[in-house]
Amino acid sequence: MTLQQLKYVVTVAECGNITEAAKQLFVSQPTVTSAIHDLEKEMQIVIFIRTNKGVILSEDGERFLGHARQVLEQVDLMEGIYKDDVVSKPHFAVSCQHYSFAVNAFVDVIREFDAYQYDFTIREEQTHEIIEDVTNLKSELGVIYLSSKNTEVLSKMLKHNELEFTELFTATPHVFICDSHPLASKKSITMDDLQDYPYLTYEQGEYNSQYFSEEFVSTLDSRKNIRVRDRATLFNLIIGLKGYTVCSGVISAELNGRNIISKPLDVEEYMRIGIISRKGVVLSRYAREYIEALKAHCM
């Protein structure tokens, strides 16, 4: 077993395709295929299962990938300490719903490690894209929420993709409005209060159902609905149209603006916000630090 073989395994797992991995590694496809075949033979396990669309990790492969990442991280650390002319570039990726605390936690991870160079990725995406990213190891972690309305459907989807959900905290739904909104002076807001105002939600593409919605309240309960793709547009419309959205209530003035405020929504429901990850995969130190940073921002 060589470090080169471990790098091949990690890259193929991230790409989900040997041809694409070979391009990223600047080697031929037969070279990658042969190296992984030799490794599987040596370790007496099947790491990848071949499919019509590419490759997926086997159960043994998932465990092996976690250990391979740890070994490569340790090598990166040693090279950084003992080889002045070689500076390894750490990698970490997370996919999340449009939560400001998820972005703040990402910032904390970068500041904590303060690396000379790095290649980190944060993706604010649609719910099904988050699940696909973590399933295909495009991202190590995903940040989503479960509620009484979506738990059954999403839990089945997570189980099917061999993902696990770890709850970070439970929140009661809140309404985000601008500080000049007619309802801004109320201590809490009811659904009846909101009927005359536009409801801003994030578009979910072909998965545009309440099960994949980022917002706790269904658009079916609102007369005026506007769907958007990004957070900046959503908050601009909240201000410009006196609209609203429904979320966890964890707000960041630095990211959302100081004229966006949060008010409790008067409903007997809750949101379980947490992270999703691949079962059996050992998390990197960056992923572990990110989870701790999330807890710090949400609790």
Q: Where are the regions a protein language model picked out?
A:
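Secondary-structure junction motif
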Residues: A102-D108, T151, M191, Q195-T219, ...
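Short helix-boundary/capping micro-motifs
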Residues: V10-S28
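Hydrophobic hinge/microswitch elements
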Residues: T135-S139, Y145, Q204-I261
